[in-house]
């Protein structure tokens, strides 16, 4: 058995996960500890890179100690870390710590892709991942991916050409005065509204648009213009606006994801990333997968957002596939593409 300790520090969550790779290739989660600095960023309306980096420095040691104690592990067999994509300073904190631990313990270091980690998080509760189309949707990324296995390069079928879906959520939440982060609170507000009361446009859904690409900037602008025109009216309903916006996002995401799976002839759709926790995205995906005979896989809510467990899982799959460790000179790559699962 191989025990992997993994560090996630790409944005504002400091995560340390510990997983065990068993002889049969299964990955078992032993510990998952997360410290978030989201409250420190909330007063600025978004993530401040310098604050995020400092928060990682302050939280990482304590978080790692908690994870080791919870797992009952003294010395892992492998140390891994998110090496990209993400905020440069934040990545450097986690990567530097992981390299130091690997050197001190005398174990291999694996610098792995954050986006691959989101996909790998699914295996803890849903078992080995078959060939699938993955809809990776978060604050910084919205992509459709063809995943043959977690040990092979991931193919990007399409991505957002402007705002990520999670970014659009935060911006619309700010327009509605809901604060930051906006995803969860906007979702809750939308559940109180009528999604058909305020119809909003669905970007890049025309016959000439790229089948597997997304655009949310026009939707964000449409919400802003609606608020400028109707926000002062006596019967204005923020809940209806939230519901209409959320329906537009969920409609496009799930429609294109199901279509991509059908185009490729695969039978499984995986939705991963922070926006995979959204209630309407999950419900509409379940409905459309049932209608088309697709198997839907979504990680549990606690593993949708950034965490160390997902990085441990992805690293475990690389180890199982015989991937060589990363060099201790491997550099963090803020723009690391999803097709590159590991930096050597």
Curated annotation (Swiss-Prot):
Cofactor(s), by name: Fe(2+)
Q: How many cofactor units bind, and how?
A: Binds 1 Fe(2+) ion per subunit.
**PROSITE patterns per the UniProt record, alphabetical:** GLYCOPROTEASE
Q: Where does substrate bind?
A: 136-140, 170, 183, 187, 278
The regions listed as transmembrane in this protein's record are: none
Which keywords does the record carry? Answer: Acyltransferase, Cytoplasm, Iron, Metal-binding, Transferase, tRNA processing
Alphabetical GO CC annotations of the entry are: cytoplasm
Q: Which domain of life is it from?
A: Bacteria
Q: What is its EC number?
A: 2.3.1.234
GO biological process per UniProt: tRNA threonylcarbamoyladenosine modification
As one GO molecular function, the record gives: N(6)-L-threonylcarbamoyladenine synthase activity
- What SUPFAM superfamilies does the database record attribute to this sequence? Actin-like ATPase domain
Query: Where does this protein reside within or beyond the cell?
Result: Cytoplasm
Q: Which Pfam families match?
A: TsaD (PF00814)
Q: Which CDD domains match?
A: ASKHA_NBD_TsaD_bac
Please tell me which top-level EC class this enzyme sits in: transferase
What is the reaction catalyzed? L-threonylcarbamoyladenylate + adenosine(37) in tRNA = N(6)-L-threonylcarbamoyladenosine(37) in tRNA + AMP + H(+)
Any idea which positions bind Fe cation? 114, 118, 306
Family (UniProt): Belongs to the KAE1 / TsaD family.
Record function comment? Required for the formation of a threonylcarbamoyl group on adenosine at position 37 (t(6)A37) in tRNAs that read codons beginning with adenine. Is involved in the transfer of the threonylcarbamoyl moiety of threonylcarbamoyl-AMP (TC-AMP) to the N6 group of A37, together with TsaE and TsaB. TsaD likely plays a direct catalytic role in this reaction.
Name this protein carries in UniProt: tRNA N6-adenosine threonylcarbamoyltransferase
Give the originating organism: Mycobacteroides abscessus (strain ATCC 19977 / DSM 44196 / CCUG 20993 / CIP 104536 / JCM 13569 / NCTC 13031 / TMC 1543 / L948)
User: Gene of origin?
Assistant: tsaD
């Amino acid at each position: 058995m191989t025990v992997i300790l993994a560090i996630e520090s790409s944005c504002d969550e400091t995560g340390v996960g510990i997983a065990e790779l068993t002889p049969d290739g299964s990955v078992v989660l032993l510990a998952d500890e997360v410290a978030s600095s989201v409250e420190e960023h909330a007063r600025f309306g978004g993530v401040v890179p310098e604050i995020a980096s400092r928060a990682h420095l302050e939280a990482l040691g304590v978080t790692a100690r908690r994870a080791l104690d919870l797992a009952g592990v003294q010395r892992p067999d492998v140390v891994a870390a998110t090496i990209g994509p993400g905020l440069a300073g934040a990545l450097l904190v986690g990567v530097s710590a992981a390299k130091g631990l690997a050197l001190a313990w005398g174990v291999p270091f694996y610098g792995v892709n954050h986006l691959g980690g989101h996909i790998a998080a699914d295996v803890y509760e849903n078992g080995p991942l078959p060939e699938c189309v993955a809809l990776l949707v978060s604050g910084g990324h919205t992509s459709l991916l063809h995943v043959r296995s977690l040990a092979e390069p991931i193919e990007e079928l399409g991505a957002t050409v402007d705002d990520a879906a999670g970014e659009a959520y935060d911006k619309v939440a700010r327009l509605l005065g809901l604060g930051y982060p906006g995803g969860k609170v906007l979702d809750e507000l939308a559940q109180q509204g009528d999604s058909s009361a305020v119809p909003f446009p669905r970007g890049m859904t025309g016959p000439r648009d790229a089948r597997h690409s997304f655009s949310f900037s026009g939707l964000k602008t449409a919400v802003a213009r609606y608020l400028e025109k109707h926000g002062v009216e006596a019967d204005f309903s923020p809940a209806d606006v939230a519901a209409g916006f959320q329906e537009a996002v969920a409609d496009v995401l799930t429609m294109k994801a199901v279509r991509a799976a059908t185009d490729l002839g695969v039978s499984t759709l995986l939705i991963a990333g922070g926006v995979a926790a959204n209630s309407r995205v999950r419900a509409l995906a379940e409905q459309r997968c049932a209608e088309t005979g697709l198997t839907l896989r979504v990680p549990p809510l606690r593993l949708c957002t950034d965490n160390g467990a997902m990085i441990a899982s992805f690293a475990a799959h690389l180890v199982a596939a015989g991937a060589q460790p990363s060099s201790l000179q491997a550099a963090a790559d803020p723009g690391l593409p999803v097709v590159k699962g590991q930096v050597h």
